């Protein structure tokens, strides 16, 4: 089976790797990914992980800025005469002309149990919304945003303290396995695409800076879900500085001691030896385990207490201009 792979970030790597395994029945004849972009604090221009892997295997790579407006790339894709296009976190919408090219269609690996969490950030929003289960879906792509007919699905539990990055790693691996199963069954004609029930659709929009700001008026559980979903990017104000809250503890697993004072939302109300600090919220108190001060490396909350940067009575606050 001749495959063109569309994918860019780390999440796409396991799917590309499994197609490239020795004795694989699949022949990857091309990779399409996003252009090299500045990354990290140094803003060094780096290639996508999928590009590095493809080039190591001698696979041709295309990196159009706008696929639908690049006639040379479109012509090259047509000339490859692929049986199927596989799309895993590519980062662009495939135009109708591309969707119609491969004989068996375009197969997408999406990190949710569609029709739930259509969109760009399904992993993070599932955690932020307090879901206890998610999964991966392979679907036959159409012109809509994650609206194609479902081929196969696999469920995974979301653990109470699991972060978005941790869950993404699991889903990427499970998605790769499901992709192989999908392609094998598709070639044999053993799959019946099932249309999605649009009435049950929910959405996972692209993340914005405001999504990372912590509002201590919210309940402890909601804040914990937000912190782990978007880790390590959630932030709050502390004495005029912007501080990142990297890790918290699940309230149901680490309830505050009965003698802990209630405090006002955002106030550091107690210490947990070897664990962190308790912060009052709109409903209950939340145990904060790890944080990061401006210009510093991530530290345990206990180290911040020992260093005098954090103490009982201090108050986290919403920043006016995140």
Swiss-Prot record:
<dbReference type="InterPro" id="IPR041711">
    <property type="entry name" value="Met-tRNA-FMT_N"/>
</dbReference>
<keyword id="KW-0808">Transferase</keyword>
<dbReference type="InterPro" id="IPR002376">
    <property type="entry name" value="Formyl_transf_N"/>
</dbReference>
<comment type="function">
    <text>Attaches a formyl group to the free amino group of methionyl-tRNA(fMet). The formyl group appears to play a dual role in the initiator identity of N-formylmethionyl-tRNA by promoting its recognition by IF2 and preventing the misappropriation of this tRNA by the elongation apparatus.</text>
</comment>
<feature type="binding site">
    <location>
        <begin position="112"/>
        <end position="115"/>
    </location>
    <ligand>
        <name>(6S)-5,6,7,8-tetrahydrofolate</name>
    </ligand>
</feature>
<dbReference type="InterPro" id="IPR044135">
    <property type="entry name" value="Met-tRNA-FMT_C"/>
</dbReference>
<dbReference type="InterPro" id="IPR036477">
    <property type="entry name" value="Formyl_transf_N_sf"/>
</dbReference>
<dbReference type="InterPro" id="IPR005793">
    <property type="entry name" value="Formyl_trans_C"/>
</dbReference>
<dbReference type="InterPro" id="IPR001555">
    <property type="entry name" value="GART_AS"/>
</dbReference>
<protein>
    <recommendedName>
        <fullName>Methionyl-tRNA formyltransferase</fullName>
        <ecNumber>2.1.2.9</ecNumber>
    </recommendedName>
</protein>
<dbReference type="GO" id="GO:0004479">
    <property type="term" value="F:methionyl-tRNA formyltransferase activity"/>
</dbReference>
<keyword id="KW-0648">Protein biosynthesis</keyword>
<dbReference type="InterPro" id="IPR005794">
    <property type="entry name" value="Fmt"/>
</dbReference>
<dbReference type="Pfam" id="PF02911">
    <property type="entry name" value="Formyl_trans_C"/>
</dbReference>
<dbReference type="Pfam" id="PF00551">
    <property type="entry name" value="Formyl_trans_N"/>
</dbReference>
<comment type="similarity">
    <text>Belongs to the Fmt family.</text>
</comment>
<dbReference type="InterPro" id="IPR011034">
    <property type="entry name" value="Formyl_transferase-like_C_sf"/>
</dbReference>
<dbReference type="GO" id="GO:0005829">
    <property type="term" value="C:cytosol"/>
</dbReference>
């Amino acid at each position: 089976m001749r495959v063109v792979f569309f994918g860019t970030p780390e999440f796409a790597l396991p799917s590309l790797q499994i197609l490239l395994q020795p004795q694989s029945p699949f022949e990857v004849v091309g990779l399409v990914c996003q252009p090299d972009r500045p990354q990290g604090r140094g803003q060094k221009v780096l290639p996508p992980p999928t590009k590095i892997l493809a080039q190591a295997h001698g696979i041709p790579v295309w990196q159009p800025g706008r696929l639908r407006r690049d006639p040379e790339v479109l012509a090259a894709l047509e000339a490859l005469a692929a049986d199927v296009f596989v799309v895993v976190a590519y980062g662009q919408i495939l135009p109708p002309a591309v969707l119609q090219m491969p004989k068996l269609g375009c197969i997408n690996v999406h990190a949710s149990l569609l029709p739930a969490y259509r969109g760009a950030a399904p992993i993070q929003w599932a955690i932020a919304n307090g879901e206890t289960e998610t999964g991966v879906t392979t679907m036959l792509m159409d012109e809509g945003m994650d609206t194609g007919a479902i081929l196969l699905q696999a469920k995974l539990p979301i653990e109470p303290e699991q972060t978005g990055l941790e869950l993404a790693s699991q889903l990427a691996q499970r998605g790769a396995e499901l992709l192989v199963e999908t392609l094998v069954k598709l070639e044999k004609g053993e799959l019946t695409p099932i249309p999605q029930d649009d009435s049950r659709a929910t959405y996972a929009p692209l993340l914005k800076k405001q999504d990372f700001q912590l509002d201590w008026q919210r309940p402890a559980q909601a804040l914990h879900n937000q912190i782990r979903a978007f880790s390590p990017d959630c932030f709050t104000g502390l004495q005029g500085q912007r501080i990142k809250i990297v890790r918290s503890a699940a309230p149901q697993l680490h309830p505050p001691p009965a003698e802990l004072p209630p405090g006002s939302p955002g106030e550091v109300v107690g210490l947990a030896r070897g664990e962190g600090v308790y912060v009052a919220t709109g409903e209950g108190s939340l145990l904060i385990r790890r944080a990061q001060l401006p210009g510093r490396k991530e530290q345990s909350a206990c180290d911040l207490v020992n260093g005098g940067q954090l103490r009982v009575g201090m108050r986290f606050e919403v920043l006016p201009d995140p």
